[in-house]
Amino acid sequence: MTIFNRERLTNDVFKIDIKRMRRGWYSDKYFENIGVMLSTLAQQGYVFKGEALRFGDVDLSKTEVGNLEVEMQWFTRRSGKVVVAGVDKVLMMLKHCSGYFNGNGKFVNTWNRLEVEAVHDGATVTYSGDPTSIQPVIRVRGRYRDFALLETPTLGLLTR
């Protein structure tokens, strides 16, 4: 438990199936489709062409849809106090499997381009039942298509 010594466990402990995880073996097809769609839009240089009324006068016409950067948060919706586990393994999945395959079929790891914040395994978080008041256990900011494929396995780990 890393809450005691603040040291993260590594993949030497977990032995994640990196090769298959990078290929979407453990992911819902939906997330694979999203990754393909965003990669295709990026290759085509597609930019936002619609209207975004809630952004007012902000010009979004140069927004590259395929390269959108997002903040994704993992949090509990189980009421009361929850002991968090699985964070270190999720971080290893993100570290070894965030990225894409280039035109030559070589995996390009993009972990170093992500901004990641996470609590330590063993930490406690609470949820009051109010969906506007959550405590994220992990936050990742970066290009969504680089880690979309990991949504299913990371959620699965944290919800066991």
Feature map (PLM): residue ranges:
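Ordered alpha/beta subdomains of enzyme catalytic regions
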Residues: 1-160
